[in-house]
Amino acid sequence: MLTMNDAPFWKTKSLTEMTGEEWESLCDGCGLCCLNKLEDWDTGEVVFTSVRCVLLDGESCRCSDYENRRATVPDCIQLDLKKVHEIGWLPPTCAYALVRDGKDLYWWHYLVSGDIETVHEAGISARGRTVSEAHVDVDDFEDYVVDWPLTVGEKAGEKQRT
């Protein structure tokens, strides 16, 4: 029988109670946060593009210079406790949002599966679907608007790795 001490940290701790290491480990490596977004100034609506940050590795979906990212990308949004509660564009599969809302992580999250590849195998990540902002003029970002970052998790809990 599992006790609270046996349960994983994301089931027993709130985001505010997590250590720095636990907080960082919640990132599932999907890369969706690092896609450029456009905001309608009149309505405030935010849409995703398939244009990724220059530092996001398109294959691993991890930042290529995480420790120094703000030196290269000064407007990089560092997800913290305050922002998790304020940002309305977090993908529905985001572990930070799930834990914030008292939900469990999906089967494909590496903390559950034990394998960092399951986020890609489940089709949740940005792998193979993006272009670097280094190759797209900012005036052309509207040509890259996509909705899949908001729909990738619609069936995330239905199938499991075989």
From Swiss-Prot:
Protein name: UPF0260 protein Atu0932
Pfam families linked: CxxCxxCC
Organism: Agrobacterium fabrum (strain C58 / ATCC 33970)
InterPro entries for the chain: Puta_zinc/iron-chelating_dom, UCP006173
Superkingdom per UniProt: Bacteria
HAMAP family attached to this UniProt entry: UPF0260
Family designation: Belongs to the UPF0260 family.
Signal sequence interval, chain numbering: none
